[in-house]
From Swiss-Prot:
<comment type="similarity">
    <text>Belongs to the protein kinase superfamily. Ser/Thr protein kinase family.</text>
</comment>
<dbReference type="InterPro" id="IPR008271">
    <property type="entry name" value="Ser/Thr_kinase_AS"/>
</dbReference>
<dbReference type="GO" id="GO:0004674">
    <property type="term" value="F:protein serine/threonine kinase activity"/>
</dbReference>
<feature type="domain" description="AGC-kinase C-terminal">
    <location>
        <begin position="959"/>
        <end position="1057"/>
    </location>
</feature>
<dbReference type="GO" id="GO:0005634">
    <property type="term" value="C:nucleus"/>
</dbReference>
<dbReference type="GO" id="GO:0005737">
    <property type="term" value="C:cytoplasm"/>
</dbReference>
<feature type="modified residue" description="Phosphoserine">
    <location>
        <position position="1211"/>
    </location>
</feature>
<feature type="active site" description="Proton acceptor">
    <location>
        <position position="713"/>
    </location>
</feature>
<dbReference type="InterPro" id="IPR000719">
    <property type="entry name" value="Prot_kinase_dom"/>
</dbReference>
<keyword id="KW-0723">Serine/threonine-protein kinase</keyword>
<feature type="binding site">
    <location>
        <position position="618"/>
    </location>
    <ligand>
        <name>ATP</name>
    </ligand>
</feature>
<feature type="modified residue" description="Phosphoserine">
    <location>
        <position position="525"/>
    </location>
</feature>
<feature type="domain" description="PAS">
    <location>
        <begin position="28"/>
        <end position="98"/>
    </location>
</feature>
<dbReference type="InterPro" id="IPR050236">
    <property type="entry name" value="Ser_Thr_kinase_AGC"/>
</dbReference>
<keyword id="KW-0418">Kinase</keyword>
<keyword id="KW-0597">Phosphoprotein</keyword>
<dbReference type="GO" id="GO:0106310">
    <property type="term" value="F:protein serine kinase activity"/>
</dbReference>
């Protein structure tokens, strides 16, 4: 393995020509080996002997080396002698001076087949037996032990060697290996500085750096640092989620043990059970002495455990409140001294377990595993934060030096006044506040003295330090710890080190400039992390200047402490600390309108204030969830949705958070409604529709079953229609755990007991192996409530939860019968429904026999399988039964076991009394009937699908289905909303006119429940007192029932950041090649278009704003046909009266294909050439990628449309005057339109071909007099259309339908129509037809 020498002086001290040559070489050297998408970097730790003591799990992905072949091995064994020598030189340098980061470039051989799979090759795959030698960059820092500051190890992060896009100036070449492509963006900014100065000949006109919006931390980041920051941000957010999940687990432990103590105080005869063994044996039964009784007392043991848990819970990662000078970067601290002391105390804490039973030992080992998981996560998080801060500070420092050099060169010919200003000293030092916001006064770390009593060069605080406090994320969410997706880079020095060396930094006084505008700057503090830190911060004010989640925006104003321009050189601020709220809140969203109401919560359409993205927010009231015993349901649904983040079959979950009284699940907004609403509108579905929808549902359920998830609530209302027309499953509240065992609460009037079903069944299962790992809820079977335990049989059970953290499992044993993977789950024989166990607990009763309201089924019973009703454990076959009920309802319009009461429905299900319709079945439907019959088999073992999903796929009903491409085929229905805020396809189910202020007035959990200040771990009392119990309750940051309930879908946020990076690259390349971007071309065309309209009459602007949602980004390869409607209006000035909310066409969703399904209208003076689709205006500053769907052919089509008629303009629903006659006709019936306009001079015609557009038009509050149809509309039969309109409650429910055809005999006799218009179309035929309909005097 050949090691490339790293003498940074060879890079930095070459002449300009050599610099450009080297940059060009780097840009072309590995052209065929550059990753097409960013690969996750690898983080590892080296001891001072060069041995790996930690490496992230993605080592095999990037380096093609398994993790188990690295840990404990020497660098020489993995990277060869050259690699070992290089890293050891860097390690020795760090031990001597750790104020610098060190860079090592090495080469490593990768199997070609592995490289092909991981996108290393851009131009064809290489032979699988060939080796590829690829350069890598590693940058490391020294990590010290907390508290003692003794060197512990070195931390390194490895990335593929990067390069800029094209050559860069010598000034930024030294940053090339660090920020890669960002060096090109920095070089461009320096060019902008020079251009602006030469243009205005003034320092006051120098431009500010243009920031980019990080979707993870929601902050504005400099473009050249954005790619590196996004990796830092993702890595720290990953660790935060790990630590938060571990914190939740410890809180569950603590709450459980506390209630056990309370229960034992009220009834001392209770004996605990852990893993089916007595936790503390009865001393009398085992002839223990009095001394041993005291040693083995439960209270004493629990007190020790509570003390241990409390110390672990009190460990926090406080916010980085310290503003440090770069020369004092080693003073940066990211953890409070008390937390550091607590960590050391836990390491040395070993309680005496002598003479303890195996259950006691097992309990202690499980708790210790959870504690160790948190400690490990905290240490990793602390190191990641420290690492990212160190690298950011170095980059900021060197970038500022570069900017100062450029400005200094610009003003060399200026007056002596300017020169004198350039030579001014440091910016004013910052005055610190008297106390920190979140840390206790005694925890505030001693800072360097002010500039008044220390030398400026090393004690004063530079103004740049305002931005150098933290780059880590404010949110908690779930991503893998072991795949920290962050790249490292740092400038090096002109040191004589052979392989690695730091870059000497000039003193800050050499290049910093004072600015009186910064004299009164307030102290900045970034946000706390992780979420359980006891600190409060103000929420971010609403801002409309930021970009949409997947479209990069340009914020011109970053606030009072944002990017401001001290004179003469611009000051960079990589992070704007106050730009993100500390705690997610519903105030971050604008609730627009209700979508639907369910049994336990409501769903609303909302828009995120910072980005403009649209989401569906499910809001649940905590008190209702607890009262209705839905705690486990909520936690299970959240966990499942988190685990299905990449599934194309499940509605995506993006965020979860809570307030004092409510839970919020921010989900993907699927604007097509649900199949329940579709059925309500259509009545029944065609067989082709049924086949497609059921096939997609089969794929979805098969995928869930393969993952060990049983949905158990399959019904039309839970099948959502996405933007592209395909189905997605939602509402997993009843999944895994079953139905009836979730709807019972303990009814006890004596001893208060702990219901583990509400507390401990859904504790997170953390997988730390990949960045996409998620929290998996562990199931819990809860049998019927036991009777009051007898005196000798009272057992207090902790069993009921399985927790897996950091790959190490400890179990509160859970039953395997309802586990997602029963074969891998330990089985417990104890009753898990209660902490009390009795040997005479009753058997489970069927639902319909239960008279206790607390044990009756809550929800829709029509789709429940008979085995579930009988109380048997749920199996996968129960989902297939529900699917059979859905097929029946799709075909006939009602459930197969429908009855007036739930009890009757249950009786029908158990007796298999299917309510078949009386009509005669066709041969075509007989196959569907056979599918229903086999799915509704009473014996689960014989039910279709019991042996796997392939059984269902092989059924003749799906003979024409291509299972491999069904999700890529055109669906039967594609939603065409009028606007992004249109919810026309949803059935609100009574949720109307709700006052949203009830949600906005809710305080956050932290605001509602202030935590006590952090106490030294050593001060924790050894025994639990009454006051301590109360404090334990109040110190919980969130209700124990729901945990922290904080989650962010980092996978999608990271994709958004990567999308921004790709846009930056494309835009930079477009500028370099001097090509006109798509949006510039389109803007020019639109300007000509509007100019032509204005020659006739002035036209008011039609506003347009792009709000791309996550669903739009996910389905970016799919174009959606929009319902673009143009209606007749009297004057083009009516443009001014159009409302933006009724905009029917917005650019990011314009279709590329022909105007199928697009409706048009004609006024009295219009002809065929005048019919066209007018377009709204385009706001300036739109990114070119927003219009990637608008191809050249599309623009040509738009230009070809006629612009010659003065009265031709866009019209919108609601502008019709109801005193006029209105008709709908096919848009190709121009002859019919002209004749009708002659007959009815005041007639308004709406030209629509698409049946769905016709249906949507008729279902609005806009009256039509006649609907002309071509017989045999595609996909939706005429009878279906008529049925939907006739059964609706709109003003068009009795509108006449007239079919246009060549011969009246082609109309089936059983088709009920109001009239037939025969061709050729003449005035006489139309008059005859309409007279029969009595339309003349309408």
């Amino acid at each position: 393995m050949k090691h490339i020498k790293n003498e940074r002086e060879e890079v930095f001290l070459e002449d300009d020509q050599a610099q450009h040559s080297q940059a060009e070489l780097l840009s072309s050297k590995d052209e065929n080996l550059q990753p097409s998408i960013p690969l996750s970097p690898v983080a590892f730790e080296l001891d001072f002997s060069g041995n790996f003591q930690f490496i992230s799990d993605n080592s095999s992905e990037l380096l093609d080396i398994p993790k188990d072949k690295i840990i404990g091995h020497s660098v020489a064994e993995v990277l060869g002698t050259d690699g070992y020598n290089a890293f050891m030189r860097a390690v020795n340098c760090l031990l001597k001076d750790d104020s610098h980061s060190y860079h090592v470039r090495f080469q490593h051989s990768i199997n070609a087949n592995h490289a092909n799979q991981n996108y290393y090759t851009a131009k064809g795959d290489l032979p699988s037996d060939e080796k590829i030698t690829k350069p890598f960059d590693a940058i490391g820092i020294l990590i010290r032990h907390p508290g003692s500051a003794i060197p512990a190890h070195t931390m390194w992060v490895v990335n593929p060697a990067t390069n800029s896009l094209g050559s860069v100036s010598p000034l930024v070449t030294k940053l090339l290996d660090v920020i890669g492509f960002g060096a090109s963006l920095l070089d461009k900014y320096l060019c902008d500085l020079r251009t602006s100065y030469h243009k205005h000949n003034s320092l006051d006109a120098l431009p500010l750096p243009t920031p980019e919006f990080c979707q993870i931390c929601e902050r504005e980041i400099q473009s050249w640092f954005f790619e590196l920051h996004s990796k830092f941000c993702l890595s720290t957010s990953t660790y935060e989620s790990v630590v938060q999940a571990a914190q939740d687990s410890l809180l569950y432990f603590r709450s459980t043990l506390l209630e056990i103590q309370e229960g034992m105080q009220k009834d001392s005869s209770l004996v605990p059970v852990y893993k089916n063994e007595p936790l503390i044996v009865d001393a009398d039964d085992y002839f223990f002495t009095d001394e041993n009784k005291q040693t083995l007392s439960l209270c004493s043991f629990l007190s020790q455990v509570m003390y241990y848990l409390e110390v672990a819970i009190d460990i926090t990662i406080p916010p980085v409140k310290i503003i440090v000078n770069f020369d004092k970067v080693d003073s940066l601290r990211v953890q409070s001294p008390r937390s550091e002391k607590a960590t050391i105390e836990l390491d040395n804490y070993n309680p005496s377990l002598e003479n303890c039973s195996s259950a006691v030992i097992a309990l202690w080992e499980d708790i210790k595993t959870a504690v160790d998981t948190k400690i490990t996560g905290v240490l990793r998080l602390r190191n990641a934060i420290y690492y990212s801060e160190r690298i950011r500070l170095e980059i900021d420092h060197h970038v500022q030096e570069i900017i100062d050099d450029v400005v200094s060169n610009l003003v060399t010919n200026h007056s002596s006044t300017s020169l004198g200003h350039l030579e001014s000293k440091l910016a004013p030092s910052i005055t610190f506040p008297d106390a920190c916001d979140a840390l206790e006064a005694e925890e505030c770390i001693t800072r360097p003295g002010s500039a008044t009593n220390t030398p400026q060069s090393d004690r004063s605080l530079d103004i740049n330090d305002l931005s150098r406090s933290s780059s880590y994320s404010r949110h908690l969410s779930h991503v893998s710890l072991s795949n920290p997706d962050f790249a490292i880079g740092s400038p090096m020095s002109q040191d004589s080190s052979n392989y690695s060396s730091p870059l000497h930094r000039r003193k800050a006084s050499d290049s910093n400039f004072s600015d009186p505008r910064f004299d009164d700057l307030k102290y900045l503090s970034p946000n706390s992390s992780p979420r359980f830190v006891a600190s409060d911060g103000p929420n971010r004010p609403a801002s409309n200047g930021r970009s949409s989640l997947f479209s990069r925006g340009r914020a011109s104003n970053l606030g009072d402490v944002g990017l401001r321009l001290p004179s003469p050189s611009p000051r960079i601020h990589t992070i704007v600390p106050n730009s993100a709220p500390e705690h997610p809140s519903i105030n971050d969203y604008k609730i627009l309108k209700p979508i639907s109401k369910g049994a336990f919560g409501s769903v609303y359409l909302a828009q995120k204030r910072t980005t403009g993205d649209y989401f569906a927010i499910k809001i649940l009231k905590k008190s209702n969830m607890i009262a209705k015993n839905q705690v486990i349901n909520v936690r299970a649904e959240r966990a499942i949705l988190m685990s299905q983040g990449e599934s194309p079959f499940v509605a995506k979950l993006y965020y979860t958070f809570q307030s004092k009284d409510y839970l919020y699940l921010v989900m993907e907004y699927l604007n097509g409604g649900d199949c329940g609403s579709l059925l309500k509108t259509m009545g029944v579905l065609d067989l082709d529709w049924i086949r497609t929808y059921i096939a997609e549902t089969v794929l979805c359920l098969g995928d869930l079953h393969d993952r060990g998830i049983i949905h158990r609530d399959i019904k039309p209302e839970n099948l959502l229609i996405s933007q592209n027309g395909h189905l997605k499953l939602t509402d997993f509240g009843l999944s895994r755990v079953g139905y009836m065992k979730r709807h019972r609460r303990k009814q006890s009037s004596s001893i208060p007991v702990l219901d583990l079903r509400d507390r401990s069944s859904a504790i997170s299962d953390l997988s730390l192996s990949t960045a996409s790992s998620v929290l998996e809820a562990q199931s819990l079977i809860t049998p019927e409530r036991p009777k009051r335990p007898s005196l000798n049989e009272k057992l207090l059970s902790l069993d009921g939860t399985s927790i897996r953290l950091a790959g190490q499992s400890f179990n509160y044993e859970n039953s395997a019968e309802d586990s997602p993977t029963a074969t891998n789950t330990p089985t417990s024989q104890v009753d898990e429904s209660n902490i009390f166990r009795s040997t005479d607990s009753p058997r489970v009763q069927p639902f319909f026999e239960n008279k206790d309201p607390s044990k009756r089924f809550i929800g829709t019973p029509d789709y429940i399988a008979p085995e579930v009703i009988l109380g048997n454990p749920g199996i996968k076959a129960s989902d297939w039964w529900s699917l059979g009920c859905v097929v029946f309802e799709f075909l006939f319009g009602y459930p197969p076991f429908n009855a007036e009461t739930p009890d009757q429905v249950f009786q029908n299900i158990l007796a298999r009394r299917i309510n078949w319709p009386a009509e005669v079945f066709t041969a075509e439907s007989s196959v569907a009937l056979d599918l229903i019959d086999r799915l509704l088999c009473m014996n689960p073992a014989n039910r279709l699908g019991a042996n796997g999903v392939e059984e269902i796929k092989a059924h003749p009903f799906f003979k024409s289905v291509n299972w491999d491409t069904i999700l890529e085929e055109d669906p039967p229905f594609v939603p065409k909303p009028f606007s992004p805020e249109d919810t026309v396809y949803f059935d609100s189910r009574g949720l109307k006119g709700f006052d949203f202020s009830e949600y906005y007035n809710q305080p956050t959990v932290t605001e509602a429940q202030k935590l006590e200040e952090e106490r030294p771990a050593s001060s924790i009392p050894q025994h639990v007192s009454g006051n301590r119990k109360g404090r334990l309750r109040s110190n919980t940051i969130s209700t124990p029932e729901f945990g922290s309930f904080t989650y962010r879908n980092l996978d999608f946020l990271n994709k958004a950041n990567r999308n921004t990076i790709q846009k930056l690259r494309k835009e930079h390349m477009a500028v370099k090649s001097a090509k006109t971007s798509v949006d510039d071309t389109f803007s020019q065309y639109m300007s000509r278009f509007k100019a032509k309209l204005s020659t006739s009459q002035s036209v008011g602007p039609v506003k347009s704003s792009r709000r791309a949602s996550m669903a739009d980004y996910e389905a970016s390869t799919t174009t959606r046909v929009q319902d673009i409607t143009t209606d007749s209006i009297d004057s083009i000035d009516d443009f001014d009266s159009l409302k933006e909310g009724r905009m029917l066409s917005f650019f990011d969703n314009l279709a590329l294909e022909d105007h199928k399904g697009v409706s048009s209208t004609m006024s009295a003076s219009q002809s065929q050439s005048s019919m066209h689709t007018a377009l709204p205006d385009v706001t300036e500053g739109t990114s070119s990628d927003e219009h990637t769907t608008i191809q050249k052919g599309r623009i040509d089509n738009l230009q070809a449309q006629s612009l010659t008629h003065k009265r031709n303009a866009i019209s919108y629903p609601g502008l019709f005057q109801l005193d006029r006659l209105q008709m709908i006709i096919p848009k190709d019936e121009i002859e019919l339109a002209e004749i009708l306009k002659k007959i009815f001079p005041k007639l308004t015609l709406v030209l629509i071909d698409d049946p769905w557009s016709i249906l949507k038009k008729l279902l609005q509050n806009e009256q039509f007099n006649v609907v002309f149809l071509h017989f045999g509309n595609d996909k939706v039969s005429s009878s279906r259309l008529m049925y939907s309109v006739r059964t609706s409650a709109t003003i068009n429910s009795r509108v006449p339908f007239v079919y246009i055809c060549e011969d009246e005999t082609c109309i089936p006799t059983d088709l009920q129509s109001d009239g037939v218009l025969l061709k050729p179309i003449t005035c006489e035929n139309i008059e005859s037809c309409l007279r029969k309909l009595d339309v003349w005097h309408s």
